[in-house]
Amino acid sequence: MPSIFEKYHLKQVINTSGRMTALGVSTPRPEVVEAAMAGMNQYFEMKDLVNKTGEYIAKLLDVEGATVVSCASAGIAQSVAAVLVKDSDWLLENLHVTPIENNEIVLPKGHNVNFGAPVGTMVALGGGKLVEAGYANECSADQLAAAITPRTAA
């Protein structure tokens, strides 16, 4: 049986950078692989699993709520959407249909990076408009405060 590199003509690399989206992010521990395999061979309502894992993680972290996401990009987009949608069922299903007045997301300039996808793109996918504050190597509380306007959502 050919390796994945041979089968798909992939270039094998040595990861000296740590966890990076461009390199597949991580190598799971054996117990994680085992848990995933067990889950893949069972049937259950995904909504129930999402809700219960969120409750479990929130309790572990002692926070109000938590949600498991598939990747950092999804987490950013979903977090922005949650801030904008709040409790509006209509907006939840029509996020990009109508302009949202208060959709600005303030972010220190140095945090607007491309980790496999630009943070600004994820903010836009979540319905937000990115507003950078400060500089790539510095962002003070005053610079953050100056970027906040009546249109700021977060």
State what each model feature region is:
Residues R29-A74, A82, W90:
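Conserved N-terminal alpha-helix of the aminotransferase class I/II PLP-enzyme fold
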Residues H96, N114-M122, A145:
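Active-site-proximal loop->helix
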Residues N137-A154:
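Active-site phosphate-binding strand-loop segment of PLP-dependent enzymes
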